[in-house]
């Protein structure tokens, strides 16, 4: 397989980024396709999907001409600037490695791989092939969380933060028939959000991981200290009453309590009433979920990075740190 010549990394801002997408499942078509379709800086030129019905449905819905059963053939023919690989995590590594070796910038869903070592190797491949990489840790980019953190930091650095992810999965089996654990596959959203809120590097971890009425780990709780001086609390539990993702962000005299989907509030100076409400739809100016919950913003960030040659915030090297914190949570049980 011949490696095509790379385009220059630094691009003219007005030129649209040509994107090819591998995968046309539910997550891809509800978040990534609409985000890219709505982005004036990007153009989806092709889709590759083994399921022809899904491929044609997605291509018809978003007006995509290129349709392929082979992602390698798609890249060779379409010569995209960037490729999105949106598929189950245990199918990812070889596809990601091949895409980058073919000279394309790469954006993937979380988790970026099955293990922290695989993620580190992907970061090395990205560096060696001089391509940009990004992972869909969209909670960082959700307006409630991103703007909430910024508002708190006007008073000083974040000293404490909490990230929770609860689901009602009572009686449910493990993810992908046991191919991957819940913390790495899904609750990693809260792990990455905690890293983002606290800043700095992980210094110490104390955790409690449980199999609650199940044969797989479904409860992950942790206390994490960071070199920034902040302390973070992680609470993820798949045996609760309902699905909910929440954060607490605390700087001196000011706090955010919020949910990136349901909204939040900013409190300060011991006042009972919030000084500002955080409505995700009002903050982004849209009622569309892919805009209000962070998907559009994380996609837009990646596209802008491709245009400018800047490494995305959630690149594989940074994602390796999130995956390593997942490892530490398992290794640091009290």
Segments (PLM) and residue ranges:
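N-terminal Rossmann-like dinucleotide-binding module
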Residues: 2-62
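C-terminal helix-rich "cap/oligomerization" subdomain common to oxidoreductases
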Residues: 2-16, 82-85, 227, 301-334
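Beta-loop-alpha module in the N-terminal Rossmann-like domain of NAD(P)-dependent dehydrogenases
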Residues: 51, 65-123
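Hydrophobic residues in well-ordered beta-strands that form the structural core
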Residues: 68, 108, 133-135, 162, ...
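A contiguous active-site-proximal alpha/beta segment in oxidoreductase catalytic domains
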Residues: 113-172
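Mid-domain beta-loop-alpha active-site segment that forms a flexible
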Residues: 136-144, 169-202, 318-319
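C-terminal glycine/acidic-rich active-site capping loop/insertion
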Residues: 138, 248-317, 321
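Contiguous beta-strand/loop segments that form the cofactor/metal-binding neighborhood of enzyme cores
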Residues: 185, 191-263, 296-310
């Amino acid at each position: 397989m011949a490696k095509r010549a790379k385009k220059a990394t630094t691009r003219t801002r007005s030129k649209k980024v040509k994107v090819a997408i591998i995968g046309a499942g539910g997550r891809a078509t509800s978040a990534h396709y609409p985000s890219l379709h709505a982005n004036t800086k990007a153009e989806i030129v092709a889709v590759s999907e083994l399921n022809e019905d899904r491929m044609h449905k997605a291509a018809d819905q978003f007006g995509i001409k290129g349709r392929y059963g082979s992602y390698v053939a798609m890249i060779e023919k379409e010569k995209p600037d960037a490729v999105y690989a949106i598929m189950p995590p245990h199918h990812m590594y070889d596809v990601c490695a091949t895409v980058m070796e073919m000279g394309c910038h790469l954006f993937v869903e979380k988790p970026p791989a099955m293990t922290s070592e695989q993620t580190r190797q992907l970061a090395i491949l990205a560096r060696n092939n001089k391509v940009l990489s990004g992972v869909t840790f969209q909670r960082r980019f959700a307006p409630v969380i991103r703007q909430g953190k910024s508002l708190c930091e006007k008073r000083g650095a974040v000293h404490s933060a909490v990230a929770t992810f609860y689901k009602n999965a009572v009686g449910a089996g493990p993810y992908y028939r046991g191919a991957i654990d819940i913390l790495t596959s899904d609750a990693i959203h809260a792990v990455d959000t905690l890293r983002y809120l606290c800043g700095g590097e992980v210094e110490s971890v104390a955790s409690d991981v449980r199999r609650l009425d199940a044969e797989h780990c479904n409860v992950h709780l942790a206390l994490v200290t960071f070199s920034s001086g902040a302390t973070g609390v992680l609470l993820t539990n798949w045996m609760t009453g309902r699905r909910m993702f929440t954060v607490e962000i605390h700087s001196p005299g000011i706090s955010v309590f919020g949910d990136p989907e349901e909204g939040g509030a900013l409190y300060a100076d011991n006042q009972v009433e919030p000084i500002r409400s955080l409505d995700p739809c009002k903050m982004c100016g849209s009622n569309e979920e892919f805009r209000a919950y962070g998907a559009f913003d994380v996609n837009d960030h990646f596209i802008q990075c491709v245009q400018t040659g800047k490494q995305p915030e959630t690149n594989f090297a940074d994602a390796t740190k999130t995956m390593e914190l997942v490892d530490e949570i398992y290794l640091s049980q009290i």
